[in-house]
A protein has these predicted regions:
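Active-site beta-loop-alpha junctions of metal-dependent nucleic acid enzymes
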Residues: 14-36, 41
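Charged phosphate-binding loop/patch that engages nucleotide di/tri-phosphates or the phosphate backbone
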Residues: 120-133
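Well-ordered beta-strand positions
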Residues: 3-4, 14, 92
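Conserved, well-structured core segments
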Residues: 1, 12, 97-98, 118-122
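A residue-level signal for conserved active-site and pocket-lining positions in enzyme catalytic cores
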Residues: 8, 94, 123
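Helix-centered, glycine/charged polyanion-binding patches within enzymatic domains
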Residues: 19, 37-113
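Short small-residue beta-strand/loop micro-motif enriched in glycine and branched aliphatics
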Residues: 10-13, 108
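Short conserved beta-strand segments at catalytic cores or DNA/RNA-binding microdomains
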Residues: 1-10, 19, 26
């Protein structure tokens, strides 16, 4: 899982197995961020439509979660259209993943230990940041 800024540059990366749901990985990813301060808002897809996650991010990190509601949502909507305008900027995180796919060791996980793979992902993020400077 990765978190990027408004330019698509990496702010945090976290490596986990493929089995946990993405909402379970948000907090560990925010704890492993490269900067001291947390981002103002997180923009996610419909999988992040979770009221407990929204409250948890707001209370622990002061982060606003922007995610469109699922079509099967039974509770009342918590976001209006003004907040969801920021969802259009979600392509920037997809650009970060495209940049990460330029590194062969990151595309397919060949490493047995997750620490080694995390090191490769962090090295790729460092190269991306150096290219931006």
């Amino acid at each position: 899982m990765a978190i990027s800024d408004g330019h698509g540059l990496p702010l945090a990366v976290h490596v986990a197995s493929a089995s946990p749901h993405e909402t379970k990985l948000v907090e560990p990813t925010l704890q492993q961020r490269f900067l001291a301060e947390a981002p103002e808002r997180l923009i996610g897809d419909r999988a992040y439509d979770s009221d407990p996650l929204d409250v948890q991010l707001r209370e622990r990190f002061g982060v606003q979660l922007v995610a469109p509601h699922k079509c099967t949502r039974s509770k009342a909507p918590t976001q209006d259209g003004r907040v969801l305008r920021r969802y259009r900027r979600r392509w920037k995180i997809e650009r970060l993943f495209a940049w990460l796919h330029n590194f062969r060791r990151v595309v397919i996980r060949w490493e047995y230990y997750p620490e080694n793979f995390l090191g490769m992902v962090q090295l790729a993020c460092a190269v991306i940041l150096l290219r931006y400077l």
